[in-house]
């Protein structure tokens, strides 16, 4: 999506888990990756499980930033939503964040509703891509099987 601040690569909710989707956005010229989402956990999960889930979510975003040399902005909802199918519903964990093109935290919200206002240096991506030329050095001739659901 072309905007006044640059080209946004938007991956909504579940799509943000796929590194291929982030890579396609980078190859299409995205200046930053934007991940609007609504992710949380079952309130009955033990704390260790909650921590594992949230940490995996953040780690995947950091990996997308590094692998593509792009900032990642992830905005997640907060609060509880009851479910007619499940008595416990879902607790949304918040933790919206802004990452730089090397996966570093620029800003992070907590578990409450928060407005983050952040300056992101989009020019840094080019510098990072010179240090780590992952897009240049990828072996596209070896990736044909990515278009198949399973490899026989």
Spans of model-derived segments:
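Cysteine/selenocysteine-centered motifs that mediate thiol-based redox chemistry or coordinate metal-sulfur cofactors
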Residues: 2-5, 12-14, 23-27, 37, ...
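CN hydrolase (nitrilase-like) catalytic-core segments centered on the catalytic cysteine
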Residues: 7, 16-116
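A short, polar/charged loop-to-alpha-helix boundary motif
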Residues: 113-131
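Active-site beta-strand termini and strand-to-loop segments that position acidic
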Residues: 1-4, 101, 120
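Alpha-helix N-cap/helix-start capping motif
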Residues: 15-16, 122
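Generic alpha-helical secondary structure signal
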Residues: 55, 59, 123-126, 141
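Residue-level signal for alpha-helical context at structural boundaries
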Residues: 79, 120-121, 143-146
């Amino acid at each position: 999506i072309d905007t006044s601040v640059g080209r946004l690569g938007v991956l909504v909710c579940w799509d943000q888990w796929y590194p291929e989707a982030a890579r396609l956005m980078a190859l299409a010229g995205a200046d930053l990756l934007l991940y609007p989402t609504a992710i949380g956990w079952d309130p009955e999960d033990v704390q260790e499980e909650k921590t594992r889930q949230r940490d995996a979510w953040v780690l995947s975003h950091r990996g997308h930033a590094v692998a593509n040399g792009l900032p990642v902005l992830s905005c997640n909802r907060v609060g509880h939503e009851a479910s007619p199918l499940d008595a416990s519903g879902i607790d949304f964990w918040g933790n919206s964040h802004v990452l730089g093109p090397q996966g570093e935290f620029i800003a992070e919200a907590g578990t409450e509703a928060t407005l983050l206002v952040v300056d992101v240096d989009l020019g840094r991506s080019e510098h990072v891509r010179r240090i780590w030329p992952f897009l240049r050095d990828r072996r596209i001739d070896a990736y044909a099987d990515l278009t198949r659901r399973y490899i026989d």
